C-alpha cells in the first residue's frame, strides 16, 4: 500500500514551494522598509507558553511526547512575545519584529480522531506602544503589504475590525451571570439563542438590533454613540479609520466595523481585525491580528512597556488566491539544454554555465538525443521548458 501523508498534512509541489518563497520575500521586503527585524521563534515550545495563559484552548495545540509538557506552535505570537520579554527585554522600545514560519493546529477530523493542519505564516509584532498609535502603524503596514501582493478587484478585499472594548460596552447593561451566554450568542450571530436568554425585554431588543450593527466604521460608531453616548474608544476608532481610508481606498480594500466580531483565539485585549478576500468558492481569511497586552504582561514585561500588537498573513491561501488571477508576474521560461550525438556533455555544461551567468534558470539533459524533435518532446514533457539545442 502506498504511504499517505498524515491527516491534515500536505505535500507541496515545487511550483507551490517557489510561490510561497516568493510571497514571503515580497512581504519581508515591506517589513524591512518599515524597520522590522527578523526573528525565528522555535517550532517547539512549552505548553504554558503556547496556550498563552488559557487564551488558546489545549485541544488546538499539537502535543509532543516528551519528559516535559511540550507542543508545536499553533501561532507565533506567544513565542515572539516570550522572546521580546526575556532575551530581547533590554532592547529599546518600540521593538519591531517579523517572522515567517510554519504553524500547526490540531482539530477533530470529520471521520473522528485528530487532524493536524500545517500552514505557512508571515507576520509582524510591535511591542512597547500603547493604543491607538500601534494600530495605526500596523494597519498602515498591512495596507502596504496588500499593495505589494497586488490583489485584484475580483478578490474584493475587506478589512473586518472589532474591539474587545466594544464587546464589553455591549455587555455592560447585561446582568453579570448572563454575560457569558450573551457574549457567546453575539459572537456566533445566534439570534435564536439570544432570544431564549432571560433578559429584560428592552435590553433584549437592543441587543438583537446590535447583532446586525456592522458596516462602515462611521455608520457603526454613530449608531453606537446613540446607544451608549460619547466614549473615548469611539474617538480612537474614528481616528484610526480616518487614517486608513486613503490607503485602503487605493488598494480597493473595504473597511467594515463589527462590534460583535471576536477571533477564535482569545489572545486579544483591544483591536482585532482580519482581512478577507473572495475566491471562486467561498471567502477566505488571508490576514488576522490585533492587540494582546495581557499576553505581554503574562510574559513578564515591565510596567510601561507591557504593550503588544501584531498581525500575520496566511501564505498558502494567498498563493491559491493569486494563482487564480492574472496578477502573477510573467517570468522567462526555464531552459533545458540538450545536445545531439555529434556534441558532448562537456559542451552542454559549458552552455548551461553561460546561461546561469546571465541569471537564467537552466537544466541540462545528461544524455544525447538522436534528433532535435526528440529533445523538443522531452522539453515539453518536463514542463514546457524552452529548448536550447546544441548540434555543431
From Swiss-Prot:
GO (cellular component) term, any one: cytoplasm
GO terms classed as biological process: histidyl-tRNA aminoacylation; L-histidine biosynthetic process
Miscellaneous comment: This function is generally fulfilled by the C-terminal part of HisG, which is missing in some bacteria such as this one.
Family note: Belongs to the class-II aminoacyl-tRNA synthetase family. HisZ subfamily.
Quaternary structure and interacting proteins, as annotated: Heteromultimer composed of HisG and HisZ subunits.
Superkingdom, taxonomy of origin: Bacteria
InterPro entries: aa-tRNA-synth_II/BPL/LPL (IPR045864), HisRS-like_core (IPR041715), HisRS/HisZ (IPR004516), HisZ (IPR004517)
Native source organism of the sequence: Parasynechococcus marenigrum (strain WH8102)
Protein name, per record: ATP phosphoribosyltransferase regulatory subunit
Subcellular location: Cytoplasm
Principal place of residence: cytoplasm
Gene Ontology molecular function: any one: histidine-tRNA ligase activity
Pfam family, one: tRNA-synt_His
Signal peptide residues on this chain, from the entry's feature table: none
Pathway annotation from the record: Amino-acid biosynthesis; L-histidine biosynthesis; L-histidine from 5-phospho-alpha-D-ribose 1-diphosphate: step 1/9
Amino acid at each position: 500500500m502506498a504511504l499517505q501523508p498524515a491527516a491534515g498534512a500536505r505535500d507541496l509541489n515545487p511550483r507551490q514551494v517557489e510561490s510561497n518563497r516568493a510571497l514571503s520575500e515580497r512581504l519581508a521586503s515591506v517589513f524591512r522598509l518599515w524597520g522590522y527585524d527578523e526573528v525565528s521563534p522555535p517550532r517547539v515550545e512549552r505548553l504554558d507558553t503556547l496556550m498563552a495563559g488559557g487564551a488558546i484552548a489545549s485541544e488546538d495545540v499539537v502535543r509532543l511526547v516528551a519528559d516535559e509538557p511540550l507542543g508545536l506552535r499553533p501561532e507565533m505570537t506567544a513565542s515572539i512575545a516570550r522572546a521580546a520579554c526575556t532575551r530581547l527585554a533590554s532592547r529599546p522600545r518600540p521593538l519591531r519584529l517579523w517572522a515567517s514560519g510554519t504553524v500547526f493546529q490540531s482539530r477533530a477530523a470529520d471521520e473522528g480522531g485528530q487532524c493536524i493542519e500545517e500552514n505557512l505564516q508571515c507576520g509582524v509584532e510591535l511591542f512597547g506602544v500603547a493604543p491607538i498609535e500601534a494600530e495605526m502603524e500596523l494597519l498602515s503596514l498591512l495596507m502596504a503589504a496588500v499593495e505589494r501582493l497586488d490583489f485584484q478587484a475580483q478578490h474584493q478585499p475587506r478589512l473586518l475590525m472589532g474591539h474587545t472594548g466594544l464587546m464589553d460596552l455591549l455587555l455592560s447593561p447585561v446582568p453579570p451571570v448572563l454575560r457569558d451566554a450573551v457574549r457567546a450568542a453575539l459572537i456566533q450571530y445566534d439570534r435564536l439563542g439570544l432570544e431564549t436568554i432571560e433578559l429584560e425585554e428592552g435590553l433584549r431588543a437592543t441587543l438583537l438590533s446590535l447583532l446586525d450593527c456592522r458596516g462602515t466604521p462611521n455608520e457603526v460608531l454613530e449608531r453606537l454613540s446613540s446607544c451608549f453616548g460619547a466614549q473615548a474608544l469611539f474617538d480612537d476608532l474614528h481616528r484610526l479609520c480616518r487614517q486608513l481610508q486613503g490607503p485602503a481606498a487605493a488598494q480597493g480594500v473595504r473597511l467594515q466595523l463589527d462590534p460583535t466580531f471576536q477571533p477564535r483565539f482569545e489572545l486579544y485585549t483591544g483591536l482585532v481585525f482580519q482581512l478577507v478576500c473572495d475566491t471562486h468558492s467561498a471567502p477566505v481569511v488571508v490576514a488576522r491580528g490585533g492587540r494582546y497586552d495581557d499576553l505581554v504582561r503574562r510574559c513578564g514585561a515591565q510596567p510601561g512597556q507591557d504593550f503588544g500588537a501584531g498581525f500575520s498573513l496566511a501564505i498558502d491561501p494567498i498563493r491559491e488566491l493569486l494563482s487564480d488571477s492574472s496578477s502573477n508576474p510573467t517570468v522567462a521560461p526555464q531552459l533545458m539544454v540538450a545536445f545531439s550525438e555529434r556534441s558532448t556533455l562537456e559542451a552542454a555544461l559549458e552552455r548551461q554555465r553561460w546561461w546561469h551567468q546571465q541569471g537564467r534558470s537552466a537544466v541540462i539533459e545528461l544524455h544525447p538525443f538522436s534528433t532535435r524533435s526528440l529533445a523538443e518532446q522531452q522539453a515539453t514533457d518536463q514542463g514546457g521548458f524552452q529548448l536550447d539545442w546544441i548540434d555543431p
